[in-house]
Amino acid sequence: RTAILKLISQCDVFITNNRLKSLVRAGLDYDSLKDRFPKLIYGLVTGYGQTGPDVDAPGYDGVAFFSRSGMLADMAEPGGYPASAPGCVGDGATGAALFGGICAALLNRERTGMGDFVETSLFGNAVWLCGTMSAFEQYGYHYPKKRSEMGALYTFYKCKDGEWLHLAVTQHDRYWKPLAEALNVPELAEDERFKNAALISRNRAQLIPLLEQAFSQFDYDEIAARLRERDIVFDRMRHYRELATDPQAVANGFVKEHIYENGHSFMMAMLPVHMRNMDETGTGRGPQMGEHTDEILKQYGYSEEAILRLKEAKAVKQHP
């Protein structure tokens, strides 16, 4: 604890994802530190928030973010298996929220000289991101949905070559007729059942199979060209494995090659924010647990003997 307090005394921001009860027990919670370090920005990530019945519950991305929010259950069709949670997506969203809060707290400290406590949680971020769906539920628009209950012009269709296309038409009056023409079914736009947006929504269960049949007559590349000509919003449903080589991702620097010390390389996802007047962040791996322990402790005046004693007491660890 003494070593940690030395680090805190000279840092701008202290970040932890330990549970509150553990922090209180160690005397490292915000209330225990704020008077001693009034300029400290204290960042805390929790699973479920600062209070409530689950305040001390452990939480991971797949559980506190995806499962608790309803994302996994309600992205699947009724009666089917829940969707699989993609790894670390909730962690990334929560980290971005914490980053924004810390930046705001640092700016406020520049103005007032005071530090602050910045807290965010996996569950809280999931609730925020699913706020639209939560509102829909309160107004009678329920999940999960069968395919026949989805918007006929804002859903996915399978092409002749097996590729899936996600269609996203929201301006029905502008794009419904061009879409029907692109699919070689212009008569659908004149059909009394589908003459306007209200009728398309009301009769979507009848329209979806007709559009499924129409899309099944085209390979993806062919129908994609026809849709682009008409400025219709769509994209191919792709796979994680394609991200590393996606031409658009590469062109924009969304992925960059990183070479490890052992010579192995891979395409690393980069921060999705670019600034013209600041240097871009390069690629690089995160440090191993305890990789810089000796280096940091020496910076704070610890001798080799003192560091060895800390290791023997298992108070710190240096990665091999």
Describe the function of each predicted region.
Residues R1-V24:
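Rossmann-like NAD(P)-binding element
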Residues V13-F14, K39, V233:
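Residue-level detector of anion-binding/catalytic polar loops
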Residues L153-R230, F234:
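Aromatic-enriched alpha-helical interface/lid elements that frame and gate functional surfaces
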Residues E229-T281:
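A glycine-rich dinucleotide-binding beta-alpha-beta segment and adjacent secondary-structure elements
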Residues Q10, S22-V169:
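Active-site-adjacent "lid/gating" segments in soluble enzymes
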Residues E305-P320:
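Amphipathic terminal alpha-helices
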